[in-house]
Amino acid sequence: MAKRVQVVLTKNVNKLGKSGDLVEVAPGYARNYLLPQGIANIATPGILRQVEQRREKERQRLLAERQEAEARKTALQTIGRFVIRKQVGEGEAIFGTVTTQEVADVIKENTSQEIDRRGITLPEISKTGFYKAQVKLHPEVTAEIEIQVAPL
């Protein structure tokens, strides 16, 4: 059986791993391709320590981002209802539709939180009334808010 060499990747490599991963490869692959191209470093105890420190920092950063998103979710749900005023025609039908940008602007106006409009999911809104919207604040955190569409 051939001997394998442990290397730490410095760049993402298809079918091998992503930057910072510890992988075992054939010695020739490491010596002839990965090391000369600067794609990997031989896994020494010092480099393994550095990789572990980077992973810990990244884990802490992701945890802080998630906690901040949870706090933003709580703030949005505390307010409860956001009012959007639209011009109304006959039978409570509004002119145009309520867009995600309008919802993001109302949220910013009421909470001073910048929300990306692409993270907002709205139902089809064509009349005045109350609607539920989903606001994705983080890949794992989604807040549900209530939108009231009212006449001008």
Curated annotation (Swiss-Prot):
Give the SUPFAM superfamilies listed for this entry: L9 N-domain-like, Ribosomal protein L9 C-domain
Any one of the GO BP annotations: translation
An example of a Pfam family matching this protein is: Ribosomal_L9_C
Entry GO CC = ribonucleoprotein complex; ribosome
Summarize the protein's role. Binds to the 23S rRNA.
Q: State the name under which the record lists this protein.
A: Large ribosomal subunit protein bL9
Q: Which InterPro entries match?
A: Ribosomal_bL9, Ribosomal_bL9/RNase_H1_N, Ribosomal_bL9_bac/chp, Ribosomal_bL9_C, Ribosomal_bL9_C_sf, Ribosomal_bL9_N, Ribosomal_bL9_N_sf
The family assignment reads:
Belongs to the bacterial ribosomal protein bL9 family.
UniProt key word Ribosomal protein: yes
